[in-house]
C-alpha cells in the first residue's frame, strides 16, 4: 500500500515524522517513502494536464488489507493534524 500525504494538515512542514516512521520500522511494515517536490506532466501528443500539486509525500507500507493499512495511519503526522492521507493499493504482479 502507499500513503499519499496531502498538503492540508495544520502545521505543514513543521510536523515531526521520526516517531511515526520509527514505529513503522519497528513493526516491519515500512517500505520507504519521500517528500515530493514540484514536477511536470508529459504526454506524447495532445494537451498536457498540470501535475497534482496537493500531494507532498508518500510512504510505502506492507499491510494485509485496507483495514490494516488504515490502522497503520495512527500516528501519521498529517493524519493526526487533521490532514488528508490517501491510501492506495499497490497490486502485486
Task: Report each predicted region and the residues it spans.
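Conserved, structured core segments of small domains
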Residues: 1-93
Amino acid at each position: 500500500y502507499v500513503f499519499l500525504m496531502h498538503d492540508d494538515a495544520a502545521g505543514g512542514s513543521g510536523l515531526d515524522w521520526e516517531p511515526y516512521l520509527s514505529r513503522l520500522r519497528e513493526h516491519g511494515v515500512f517500505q520507504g517513502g519521500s517528500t515530493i517536490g514540484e514536477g511536470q506532466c508529459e504526454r506524447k501528443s495532445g494537451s498536457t494536464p498540470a501535475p497534482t500539486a496537493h500531494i507532498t509525500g508518500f510512504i510505502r507500507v506492507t499491510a494485509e488489507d485496507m483495514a490494516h493499512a488504515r490502522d497503520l495511519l495512527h500516528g501519521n503526522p498529517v493524519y493526526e493534524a487533521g490532514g488528508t492521507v490517501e491510501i492506495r493499493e499497490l497490486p502485486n504482479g
